Amino acid sequence: MNYFDNKIDQFATYLQKRNNLDHIQFLQVRLGMQIIVGNFFKILVTYSISIFLSVFLFTLVTHLSYMLIRYNAHGAHAKSSILCYIQSILTFVFVPYFLINIDINFTYLLALSIIGLISVVIYAPAATKKQPIPIKLVKRKKYLSIIMYLLVLILSLIIHPFYAQFMLLGILVESITLLPIFFPKED
C-alpha cells in the first residue's frame, strides 16, 4: 500500500498548493482519499472472492441491505484494516456461501431480524469516538434507521424467501454492530 500512500500524498499536496489549503484541510483531504482507496480495495477483494465462490449476487444483496441500515445507524468498526478485511469476507462472502448450502428456516431468520429491530430502536445511531454524530442529527438518523430497517424487513416478506434470507442477514449483522458490547467504556 506504500505506493498508493505516496500517490495520495502527492495528490493531496497538489490540491493543497492549488487550493491554498492549510495543514488541517490538507490532512482532511488526505484522510478522505485514504479512506476511499482503502474501501475500494476492501470492496475489490470481497467481491472478487464472492465471484470466485459464485456467490456474487448473494454477497451484493447482503451488503446492500447492511449498508441501507448502516448509513444512518452507524455502528462498531473493526479495530484495524486487516480485521475489517477479515470481517467483511466472513460476513459478506462466507456466511452467504454457507447459507446457500444450509437449510435455515426463514421464520427463524425473520424472528432474529425482528429482535434486531429492537437493537436498532434502542441503540441507533451508534456513534464512535472517531465518528461522533452531531446531536441535531441523532433523532433524524434514529428515525431513518428504523424506517429503512422496516422497509427491508417488509420487502423480505414480499420477495422469494431464498433471496430474502440474504436481506435479513444484512440487516441482522448491522443490528449486531449497534450493541454496546462492541464499544469500549468511556472514561
From Swiss-Prot:
Entry's transmembrane regions: 49-69, 82-102, 106-126, 144-164, 166-186
Subcellular location field: Cell membrane
Entry keyword annotation includes Membrane: yes
GO biological process: proteolysis; quorum sensing
EC class: hydrolase
Keywords: Cell membrane, Hydrolase, Membrane, Protease, Quorum sensing, Transmembrane, Transmembrane helix, Virulence
Topological category with respect to the lipid bilayer: Multi-pass membrane protein
Protein EC: 3.4.-.-
Domain of life: Bacteria
GO molecular function, a single term: peptidase activity
Assigned GO CC terms: plasma membrane
Disulfide bonding pattern of the chain: none
Pfam families in alphabetical order: AgrB (PF04647)
Family: Belongs to the AgrB family.
Biological role stated in the UniProt entry: Essential for the production of a quorum sensing system signal molecule, the autoinducing peptide (AIP). This quorum sensing system is responsible for the regulation of the expression of virulence factor genes. Involved in the proteolytic processing of AgrD, the precursor of AIP.
Protein name, UniProt field: Accessory gene regulator protein B
Originating species: Staphylococcus aureus (strain JH9)
Gene: agrB
